[in-house]
Amino acid sequence: MKKVEAIIRPFKLDEVKIALVNAGIVGMTVSEVRGFGRQKGQTERYRGSEYTVEFLQKLKVEIVVDDNQVDMVVDKIIAAARTGEIGDGKIFISPVEQVIRIRTGEKNTEAV
């Protein structure tokens, strides 16, 4: 199993969620995060003053899937989240040793 973590623009969440649900993904976790990369923040105006926001609002979408679903999930996220502009985000994939459903004790694929 793998965990797919995608850092995306907040306004792209609905498109990403719909694409994943339509592909059969039944669960995901979404967290509000802040960060910067090549985009390095942005200048904003507030009450006539300019200031630089260094850490930009993003969302982190986390999904645990079987190894054979990873490429499909990544493709769906990219297609739904891409604007073509700097700041579209990143996708990280990491191994998951074990998943346990607390309520039933089910493990691994049955727990996802």
Curated annotation (Swiss-Prot):
A GO CC annotation given for this chain: cytosol
GO BP terms: regulation of nitrogen utilization
GO terms of molecular function: ATP binding; enzyme regulator activity
O-UMP-tyrosine modifications at: 51
Domain of life: Bacteria
Keyword Nucleotide-binding: yes
InterPro entries tied to this protein: N-reg_PII, N-reg_PII-like_a/b, N-reg_PII/ATP_PRibTrfase_C, N-reg_PII_CS, N-reg_PII_urydylation_site
Alphabetic keyword roster: Nucleotide-binding, Phosphoprotein, Transcription, Transcription regulation
Protein modification: Phosphorylation dependent on the nitrogen source and spectral light quality.
Modification Phosphoserine, positions: 49
SMART domains per UniProt: P-II (SM00938)
Pfam family, one: P-II
Function: P-II indirectly controls the transcription of the GS gene (glnA). P-II prevents NR-II-catalyzed conversion of NR-I to NR-I-phosphate, the transcriptional activator of glnA. When P-II is phosphorylated, these events are reversed. In nitrogen-limiting conditions, when the ratio of Gln to 2-ketoglutarate decreases, P-II is phosphorylated which allows the deadenylation of glutamine synthetase (GS), thus activating the enzyme.
Similarity-based family: Belongs to the P(II) protein family.
Protein name in UniProt: Nitrogen regulatory protein P-II
Organism: Nostoc punctiforme (strain ATCC 29133 / PCC 73102)
Gene that this polypeptide is encoded by: glnB
